[in-house]
Design a protein with these regions (language model features):
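Short, P/G- and charge-enriched loop/turn segments at secondary-structure junctions
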Residues: 9-15
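Active-site donor/metal-binding and catalytic loop motifs
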Residues: 65-82
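Short, small-residue-biased leader/transition segments that mark boundaries at the very start
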Residues: 2-5
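Intrinsically disordered, low-complexity terminal/linker regions enriched in Pro/Ser/Gly
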Residues: 110-112
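Short acidic/polar alpha-helix capping motifs at helix-coil junctions
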Residues: 15-19, 81
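A short, conserved alpha-helix in the catalytic core of glycosyltransferases
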Residues: 18-35, 42-61, 66-67
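A generic structural signal for short coil/turn motifs at secondary-structure boundaries
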Residues: 40-42, 81
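Catalytic core of nucleotide-sugar-dependent glycosyltransferases
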Residues: 82-106
Length: 112
């Protein structure tokens, strides 16, 4: 017998709020098309939201995995939040400009 996933899993498919990358799956080709994470983010905050916003802006949709997938979290020191004001401005820029691709991402590391 299978366990059906709730219908709410498919709600808010274009909502970036609440999406976090502690347990995010994305197709490699889709990640490459938006050039991965924006490397302009430093310290704590908003780089995962920026990634999700650009995926949504490029036509991809979310599926909620809550209560359906396991989470394994590696302990790490919490990042410095001193730059969060700069990071939130980067995020606002991605939202306002409907950004899909970052200039500072995967391709800066020599991947094709």
């Amino acid at each position: 017998q299978t366990c059906a996933l709730p219908i709410w899993r498919y709600k808010n498919r274009e909502k970036w709020e609440g999406a976090i990358t502690c347990n995010l799956a994305v197709w490699r080709d889709d990640l490459y098309k938006i050039n991965g994470f924006n490397q302009q983010y430093h310290g704590w905050g908003y780089e995962d939201s920026d990634l999700v916003i650009r995926l949504i802006n490029s036509g991809k949709h979310r599926k909620e995995g809550r209560y359906a997938v396991g989470v394994i979290h590696l302990w790490h020191k919490e990042n410095d939040r001193n730059l969060s004001d700069i990071n939130i401005n980067l995020l606002k820029n991605s939202i306002q400009n409907k950004t899909t691709i970052t200039n500072t991402g995967i391709k800066n590391y020599g991947t094709d």
